[in-house]
């Protein structure tokens, strides 16, 4: 990415082509999910780029978008482009001639993929510090094609391990891109309640209301690949039909439907689809002192496996407890492998625990420590089924479900804050 108008080192992107619409949407997702007045800064903006288009589309009343031209554009071209979009947008977009003229922003987006050496990438990120408000997010892309990333990709992975609040692989881009979202200072937990659920490329749309998790797309692709190989190897045989017919059911296991989340601010929503196994008060020292209200939900192999965030908050911890793989409907499941996601919320500490089962052996969690999450937001999945527990401060919440109730993730209200 050429940052020729910036006070920190230039990083070349000569071998890299542009950012497509999907990658642009991921890069600007943190700006798009804010429902309160927000300032975004796009560095390396091209007047014809998908990144500028996505940032403009995300504008709400009260927002401010600051653009710094990249090597493929100029401030004058940006001004002409924004003016042509109408006064409503032009009034909310500010174009500066150099980065030095920009003010600190809540979301900073590098408009072109970052390449070069690790030292150059580190210098770019260090140079951005003066343009970040408290809790700001930096969104940056690096090519995900082997041999074309240099040291920048390794440095971004290192930075993501320390400060990452999200990472998306966008395969449908040329070249494929890895989007890193970094937060270098703690965010205000209260802001989580004002956010919309984050856009995740891992949720692949099939229709307007039905998505498939990327795990399902990969599994279906493998099945179809096996079918193609079988047909090529034995054209006269019908053996290829077995993996071909299996592709759709395999993808269906990973279905990820869109959900309407209740607007009641006191509502706590189900973290998964399934049947309520237990509603009880207990203690769990892993989550801290005090008593918790726990609602445990069993996911059968036929239920939607994607897990949702039950309440808005900030992820403060994530850890996995080793254990067995007992049937999730039995008491022995208490000692199964369990992944704890701990949230700081306006109502105290909340825990979401994904447990393995007899069949389910794989837990996926996509909300790193430091992430602000909205209620109903996708947070991961369990392959295939098993159990998800929600822990709430017992003195601040009342259950609204009983044992045997069927619940829908992100939609069903399982408890209400007092």
Question: Language-model segments: what does each one mean?
Answer:
Residues 122-134:
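A short glycine-rich, Lys/Arg-flanked "PGG" loop and its adjoining helix->strand segment in the class I
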Residues 182, 197-418:
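Contiguous, well-folded functional domains in the mature portion of proteins
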Residues 105-125:
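A short SAM/SAH-binding and catalytic strip from SAM-dependent methyltransferases
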Residues 47-62:
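Conserved SAM-binding loop of SAM-dependent methyltransferases across substrates and taxa
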Residues 74-102:
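S-adenosyl-L-methionine
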Residues 148-197:
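Class I S-adenosyl-L-methionine
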Residues 2-41:
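Class I SAM-dependent methyltransferase Rossmann-like catalytic core
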Residues 132-146:
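Conserved beta-strand signature within the Rossmann-like core of class I S-adenosyl-L-methionine
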């Amino acid at each position: 990415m050429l940052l020729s108008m910036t006070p920190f080192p230039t990083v070349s992107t000569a071998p890299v082509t542009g950012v497509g619409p999907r990658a642009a949407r991921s890069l600007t997702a943190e700006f798009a999910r804010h429902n309160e007045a927000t300032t975004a800064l796009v560095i390396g903006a091209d007047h014809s780029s998908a990144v500028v288009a996505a940032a403009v589309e995300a504008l709400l009343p009260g927002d401010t978008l600051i653009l710094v031209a990249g090597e493929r554009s100029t401030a004058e071209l940006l001004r002409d482009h924004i003016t042509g979009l109408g006064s409503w947008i032009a009034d909310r977009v500010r174009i500066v001639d150099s980065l030095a003229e920009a003010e600190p922003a809540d979301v900073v987006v590098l408009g072109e993929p970052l390449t070069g050496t690790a030292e150059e990438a580190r210098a770019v990120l260090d140079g951005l510090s003066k343009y970040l408000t408290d809790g700001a997010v930096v969104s940056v892309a690096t090519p995900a094609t082997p041999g074309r990333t240099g040291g920048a990709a390794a440095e971004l992975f290192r930075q993501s391990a320390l400060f990452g609040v999200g990472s998306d692989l966008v395969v449908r881009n040329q070249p494929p891109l890895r989007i890193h979202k970094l937060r270098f200072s703690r965010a205000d937990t209260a802001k989580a309640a004002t956010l919309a659920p984050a856009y995740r490329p891992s949720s692949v749309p099939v229709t307007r209301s039905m998505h498939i998790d990327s795990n399902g797309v990969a599994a279906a692709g493998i099945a179809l690949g096996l079918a193609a190989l079988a047909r090529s190897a034995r054209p006269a045989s019908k053996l290829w039909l077995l993996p071909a017919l299996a592709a759709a059911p395999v993808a269906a296991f990973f279905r990820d439907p869109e959900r309407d989340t209740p607007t009641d601010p006191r509502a706590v929503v189900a973290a998964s689809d399934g049947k309520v196994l237990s509603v009880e008060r207990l203690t769990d020292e892993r989550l801290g002192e005090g008593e918790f209200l726990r609602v445990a939900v069993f996911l059968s192999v036929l239920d939607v496996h994607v897990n949702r965030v039950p309440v808005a908050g900030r992820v403060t911890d994530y850890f996995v407890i080793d254990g067995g793989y007992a049937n999730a409907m039995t008491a022995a499941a208490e000692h199964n492998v369990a992944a704890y996601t701990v949230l700081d919320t306006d109502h105290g500490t909340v825990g979401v625990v994904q447990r393995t089962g007899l069949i389910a052996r794989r837990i996926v969690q996509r909300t790193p420590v430091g992430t602000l999450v909205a209620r109903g937001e996708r947070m991961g999945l369990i392959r295939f089924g098993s159990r998800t527990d929600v822990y709430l401060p017992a003195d601040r919440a009342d259950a609204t479900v009983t044992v045997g109730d069927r619940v829908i993730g992100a939609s069903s209200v399982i408890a209400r804050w007092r």
